[in-house]
Amino acid sequence: MRSILLVAAAVSLAVTTARAEPACQGRLSGKVTGTFTCDVTLTEPGDGEATFVVQPRGPIPDVPAYAPGAFRVPLPVRAGTLTLDDLGMGKASVAAEGGALYTATKTTGQRGEVTLILREAKPDPGRKGAWIVHGTYRARLIPAGAGKQGDVLVEVTF
């Protein structure tokens, strides 16, 4: 009986620990470094495209500002790989100490690189127009101003 209670306690602790881990984790490397936890959403506001957003949960020490990424995703949403060529308008940006800004964007043109891999994408039964997604997001941000060198990689697992 005692061993059953110990096993039950160990399983309960493992489940509690697993739930405490954020489902979305990100990392910056290159000219700006750091790690962050985040939330990922993929919603369809009713205009013919979905919106993918990586929303950080807090600041990164020594990083003045960062927005890991928000891009439009073509419908229908499904598992697969999307690059900046496939995605709609959007932006990822990281500001470095000293004023340098690194971006990957798609507006009328493109800069930087973005790869979004959706391993799983299924409608969220609790929220109309939303999907539950799992996968990876990677963006290579390049300097926005003249005279700056290097790049920043944003890597997110969700």
Write out the residue ranges for each language-model feature.
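A broad, structure-centric signal for solvent-exposed, well-ordered loop/edge residues
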Residues: 7-8, 35, 125
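Acidic, glycine-rich flexible loop segments
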Residues: 86-158
